[in-house]
Curated annotation (Swiss-Prot):
PANTHER family, A to Z: 30S RIBOSOMAL PROTEIN S14, SMALL RIBOSOMAL SUBUNIT PROTEIN US14M
Name of the molecule in the record: Small ribosomal subunit protein uS14
GO molecular function: rRNA binding; structural constituent of ribosome
Quaternary context: Part of the 30S ribosomal subunit. Contacts proteins S3 and S10.
One of the Pfam families matching this protein, by short name: Ribosomal_S14
InterPro entries: Ribosomal_uS14, Ribosomal_uS14_bac/plastid, Ribosomal_uS14_CS
GO cellular component: cytoplasm; small ribosomal subunit
Protein keywords: Ribonucleoprotein, Ribosomal protein, RNA-binding, rRNA-binding
Function, as annotated: Binds 16S rRNA, required for the assembly of 30S particles and may also be responsible for determining the conformation of the 16S rRNA at the A site.
Naturally occurring in which organism (per UniProt): Ehrlichia canis (strain Jake)
């Protein structure tokens, strides 16, 4: 299981990202718009760079909700492959069946 501080850091990044998403999108739209003057686009670039680094969605890591494992995490179920197998074998995930042929 991951350290609690790492899990909390990721949750903090998720909250910051969701809070500042609209502001980042507005600034990015200004930066990409060719009809706006170069000076205004540069000022938007400066404002974007002054936003917290953790407000970018790239810094969010998909982690297992149960164990906090960063790798092998299924997005659909939000759990790792190990937990998915355990929960699936005892019937805790609806619609998930063991395959046989």
């Amino acid at each position: 299981m991951s350290r609690k501080s790492v899990i909390q850091r990721n949750l903090k990044r998720i909250s910051i990202c969701s809070r500042l998403k609209s502001k980042r999108d507005e600034l990015k739209a200004i930066i990409k718009d060719q009809s706006i003057s170069m000076n205004d686009r540069f000022l938007a670039q400066v404002k974007l760079s002054k936003l917290p680094r953790d407000s970018s969605y790239i810094r969010i890591r998909n982690r297992c909700l149960v164990t906090g494992r960063p790798r092998g995490c299924y997005r659909k179920f939000k759990v790792s492959r190990i937990v998915l197998r355990q929960l699936g074998s005892i019937g805790q995930i609806p619609g998930l069946t063991k395959s046989s042929w």
